[in-house]
Structure formats: C-alpha cells, structure tokens
From Swiss-Prot:
Protein name: Ribonuclease pancreatic
Native organism: Pongo pygmaeus (Bornean orangutan)
Protein keywords: Disulfide bond, Endonuclease, Glycoprotein, Hydrolase, Lyase, Nuclease, Secreted, Signal
Molecular function via GO: lyase activity; nucleic acid binding; ribonuclease A activity
Enzyme nomenclature, EC number: 4.6.1.18
List of glycosylated residues: N50, N62, N104
Binding, substrate: K35, R38, K69, P70, V71, N72, T73, K94, R113
Reactions performed catalytically: an [RNA] containing cytidine + H2O = an [RNA]-3'-cytidine-3'-phosphate + a 5'-hydroxy-ribonucleotide-3'-[RNA]; an [RNA] containing uridine + H2O = an [RNA]-3'-uridine-3'-phosphate + a 5'-hydroxy-ribonucleotide-3'-[RNA]
Coarse class of the protein's main subcellular location: secreted
Amino acid sequence: MALEKSLVLLPLLVLILLVLGWVQPSLGKESRAKKFQRQHMDSGSSPNSNSTYCNQMMRRRNMTQGRCKPVNTFVHEPLVDVQNVCFQEKVTCKNGQGNCYKSNSSMHITDCRLTHGSRYPNCAYRTSTKERHIIVACEGSPYVPVHFDASVEDST
C-alpha cells in the first residue's frame, strides 16, 4: 500500500521539480525596465562634477563586473519625468528601430566614459555633467524606457 502511494507521488514530485526548475530562473531575471533604472537613473542626487562620482556609481550599480562598461549616462531627474519621455517626440533610434523618443526639455545628466588605458578590474571613469535632451527606447505595458540611446544638445 505504501509502495503504491510512493509510485503515484513520485511522478507528481518529479513534475513539480521540473516546473520549479523552469520557472525559477525567470523569477530572478531583471526586467529591461528595471535594468534601465539601475543603469541610468539617479534621481535622488543632483548632478555631481566630483571626479569620483562615475567610479563609485559604476561599481555600485554593477556595471564593472566581469568587464568595464565603456560608456554610461546617469539621469538626475524624477523617474516619472524620464518615463514621460516615452510620450514625447518620436525619433529613430541609432540602431534604426522606431521606438525611441526625445525629451521635450533638457535634463540634468552625468556622462561616464572609461579613461584611456583603463582595464578591468581597475575600471576608471571620466565624469562630465551636462544639460541635454535625452533619447530613450521604450516598450512594454506600461510603456516605459528600456534603453538609453543618446543625449543631444538643445537645437536652438
């Protein structure tokens, strides 16, 4: 009797373990929108021309693990303002896609560029603060930024 129950429960247990093994990796995966926020949003601080800002932020935001990310931009505006860019001027992305949008107004940003000769694991960045229009790629529901495409100067 106990053996029969075990034989019935064993396939069920195997099925549950297979489903958990298939679902679990996707549970911990960062969404593109969350990745955008981690890599590009720094709403809580004002633009900082401190020369160590990029070195600290690139490490803190996990962009120097396994390699040095060559270029990154942080936006110092409220998240809702950056999300609203997805409903502003539509432009073509650098890769030719049609899901990019340019901000109507300039935003405070910090550009981080890997310094010449800098090599992993000693990633060193040049910090420069600017006021620029940003261009972001948007997707999803809700429609939100998932990629920082560029920053451009005011054309006036």
